[in-house]
Amino acid sequence: MKLCATFLLVLVTLPLVTGEKSSERSLSGAILRGVRRTCSRRGHRCIRDSQCCGGMCCQGNRCFVAIRRCFHLPF
């Protein structure tokens, strides 16, 4: 138990000693600010593939289930 407490203490104080500033873009910071990154489901609006949930592609501004890897025709 003492080893665990010591380890946590070192992790907390290490950035203070090295002079690092904590990032506001950390996951815990996002949770505290209420920022959530969610994915769009099938049929929902999207702009790019990364906005759709896993295994889906963005085509025609809507997410759809992809049988194969996402591809886009050059228009």
From Swiss-Prot:
What taxonomic ancestry is recorded? Answer: Eukaryota, Metazoa, Spiralia, Lophotrochozoa, Mollusca
So which residues are the signal peptide here? 1-19
Which Cys pairs does UniProt list as disulfide-bonded? 39-53, 46-58, 52-63, 57-70
Which superkingdom is the protein from? Eukaryota
| UniProt record similarity statement | Belongs to the conotoxin I1 superfamily.
Asked if the record carries the keyword Secreted, the reply is: yes
Q: Report the PROSITE patterns cross-referenced here.
A: I_CONOTOXIN
Provenance organism? Conus arenatus
Q: What does this protein do?
A: Both natural (L-Leu form) and synthetic (D-Leu from) peptides equally cause sensitivity to touch and body tremor. Neither L-Leu form nor D-Leu form is active on nerve-muscle preparation.
- Positions annotated as propeptide: 20-36
What's said on domains? The cysteine framework is XI (C-C-CC-CC-C-C).
Q: What is this protein called?
A: Conotoxin ar11a
Localization in the cell: Secreted
| Tissue spec. comment | Expressed by the venom duct.
From the Swiss-Prot or TrEMBL record, what is one GO molecular function term?
Answer: toxin activity
> What GO cellular component entries does it have?
extracellular region
List keywords of the entry alphabetically: Disulfide bond, Ion channel impairing toxin, Neurotoxin, Secreted, Signal, Toxin
